From Swiss-Prot:
The FMN-N(5)-oxide reacts spontaneously with NADH to produce FMN. Requires the flavin reductase RutF to regenerate FMN in vivo. The keyword Transmembrane does not apply. One of its GO terms (molecular function) is alkanesulfonate monooxygenase activity. This is Pyrimidine monooxygenase RutA. Belongs to the NtaA/SnaA/DszA monooxygenase family. RutA subfamily. Induction: Up-regulated by the nitrogen regulatory protein C (NtrC also called GlnG) and repressed by RutR. InterPro entries: Luciferase-like_dom, Luciferase-like_sf, Pyrimidine_monooxygenase_RutA, SsuD_RutA_monooxygenase. Keywords: Flavoprotein, FMN, Monooxygenase, NADP, Oxidoreductase.
Length: 393
């Protein structure tokens, strides 16, 4: 069994500036942490210098069980139906979200599990029934992430792209979709009639054992308005490299949108963690990954991001394709020593409206271990948790 380095790292705390929290931050001192599992090949680094691997159930099982051991609160998988190509064949190889998370629900016991529904591909009544099934498998630990779909070739290859006017109507579509879901989960029946869906005494039973959580990742005004009305929380991108609070205006917009509906909808922020013993060592990793950027795959991403001419400049895909840090789709990136990353995550927790983070790693298995043993014990916003060492195999 590997012993924890917590004692040595704790000696470093005094040298690292810490935040002063106010009394209202008691909830934030328990900031939620999730793992964005690598359902697609190579995770979230579009680089020939990054670890190259295929997505498998066994890999994701090991990741989520390790995350559960270190008291991560949730695991989320995306859905991707066509990749970016290039030398790395980035995201050309993907598992399916609901079936993967059903399997992971069966081999975990505490961690919350979220699958993503590509709503153009799955009727809401089928999603309602699949979700109720995974609720049964997990003992009430399951929820659904709803996405409208932005990458036209994913759907065009199957002949189900509804036309480019969908870009401007996609949240109208999603609004009807979630209303059908809520009917079926809440009452077991739906007679909803709308522009996109017509239910005729549609039935789903058994219903979920607990209220089913719905999450979304709206960053546009329309997306945030949807989340404010229907989601339990909203994902947003972190921004920049080692600028942990740069997303604050996005969280503020989400809070403002939620105030209009009288609901409490917090922001969960997406970050990549690249950590090492020292700041310099971590920075060297990051520079190495950037130097190997797969330009062909990145060109595909840029091309697809330009096809939505109906939405504004504030959509997720616009940020993903920004050339600044496109090598990891421009998610917020925290690069540094274990103590530095812990400090930056505490800064994330200080932002009003930030209720959690969704983390990716350059190397998931070792990254979760070092996070659990070297980073999390230094975080004020996770101080309620016990210090753990690596689990015995």
């Amino acid at each position: 069994m590997q012993t924890s380095h917590y004692a040595a790292e704790k000696d470093m705390q005094d040298a690292v500036p810490r935040l002063t929290f106010t009394l209202r931050d008691e909830e934030r001192l328990m900031m939620k942490i999730g793992v964005f599992v690598p359902i697609g090949n190579n995770g979230w680094l579009i680089s020939t210098h990054a670890p190259q691997y295929m997505p498998t159930f066994e890999l994701n099982k090991a990741i989520v069980q390790k995350a559960e051991h270190y008291h991560f609160d949730f695991a989320l998988s995306m859905i991707k139906l066509r990749g970016f190509g290039g030398k790395t064949e980035f995201w050309d190889h993907n598992l399916e979200s609901f079936t993967l998370m059903a399997g992971l629900a069966a081999v975990t016991s505490r961690i919350q599990i979220y699958a993503t529904a590509a709503t153009l591909t799955l009727p809401p009544a089928i999603v309602a029934r699949m979700a109720a099934t995974i609720d049964s498998i997990s003992g009430g630990r399951f929820g659904v992430n709803l996405v409208t779909g932005w990458q036209k070739p994913e759907y065009e290859q199957m002949g189900i792209w509804p036309g480019d006017d969908y870009f401007s109507r996609r949240y109208d579509y999603l609004t009807e979709y979630v209303q059908v879901l809520r009917d079926l989960w809440g009452t077991g029946k739906s007679d909803f009639k709308g522009d996109f869906f017509t239910m005729n005494d549609c039935r789903v039973s058994p219903q979920p054992s607990v209220p089913m959580k719905v999450i979304c990742a709206g960053q546009s005004d329309a997306g945030m308005a949807f989340s404010a009305q229907y989601a339990d929380f909203n994902f947003c991108f972190g921004k920049g490299v080692n600028t942990p609070t740069a997303f604050a205006p996005t969280a503020a917009r989400m809070k403002q949108a939620a105030e209009q509906t009288g609901r409490d909808v917090g922001s969960y922020v997406l970050f990549m963690v690249i950590a090492d013993e020292t700041d310099d060592a971590a920075r060297a990793k990051w520079e190495h990954y950037k130097a190997g950027a797969d330009e062909e795959a990145l060109s595909w991403l840029t091309e697809q991001s330009q096809k939505d001419t109906r939405s504004g400049t504030d959509t997720n895909v616009r940020q993903m394709a920004d050339p600044t840090s496109a090598v990891n789709i421009n998610m917020g990136t925290l690069v540094g020593s274990y103590a530095s990353v812990a400090r930056m995550l505490d800064e994330v927790a200080s932002v009003p409206g930030a209720e959690g983070v969704l983390l990716t790693f350059d190397d998931f298995l070792s990254g979760i271990e070092t996070f659990g043993e070297r980073i999390q014990p230094l975080m004020q916003c996770r101080a309620h948790l016990p210090v753990l060492t690596q689990e015995v195999a």
